[in-house]
C-alpha cells in the first residue's frame, strides 16, 4: 500500500526530510496562516484536500492538536475515527484494522471503519 504524507504549516520545515520518513509522496499546504494551530482553518483546508485526494486511510498524531483536529475532520467527512490506537494491520480485504485497548486495558478491541477514509 503506497504511503503519502500531508504537511500543513508555515514554510519552516525540511520537506526533503519528510520524504525520508517513508512516504512515497509528500503533499504540502504551506502558508503563514498555518503558523498558529487553529482547528477550523486546518479542518476546512484538510477536508478539501482529503475529498480531492480520496485516500483510503488517514492517520493523525496523538498530540493535543491532533486529538482536537481529527474528530472535526471525521465529522466533516461523515466517517468514523478510532482514537488511542496501539497497533494497525491491513486485513485480507485491504481494510485497516485499528487496535486499541478497551475495558480498562484488559482486552484489545479490533475496529474496522466501514467507509473511506478510514481514520485513526
Question: Where in this protein do the model-derived segments appear?
Answer:
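N-terminal glycine-rich FAD/FM-binding segment characteristic of electron-transfer flavoproteins
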Residues: 1-120
Amino acid at each position: 500500500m503506497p504511503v503519502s504524507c500531508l504537511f500543513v504549516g508555515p514554510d519552516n520545515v525540511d520537506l526533503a526530510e519528510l520524504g525520508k520518513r517513508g512516504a512515497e509522496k509528500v503533499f504540502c499546504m504551506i502558508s503563514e496562516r498555518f503558523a498558529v494551530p487553529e482547528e477550523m482553518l486546518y479542518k476546512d483546508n484538510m477536508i478539501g484536500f482529503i475529498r480531492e485526494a480520496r485516500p483510503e486511510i488517514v492517520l493523525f498524531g496523538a498530540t493535543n492538536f491532533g486529538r482536537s483536529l481529527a474528530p472535526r475532520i471525521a465529522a466533516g467527512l461523515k466517517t468514523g475515527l478510532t482514537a488511542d490506537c496501539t497497533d494497525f494491520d491491513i486485513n485480507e480485504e485491504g481494510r485497516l484494522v485499528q487496535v486499541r485497548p478497551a475495558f480498562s486495558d484488559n482486552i484489545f478491541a479490533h475496529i474496522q471503519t466501514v467507509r473511506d477514509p478510514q481514520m485513526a
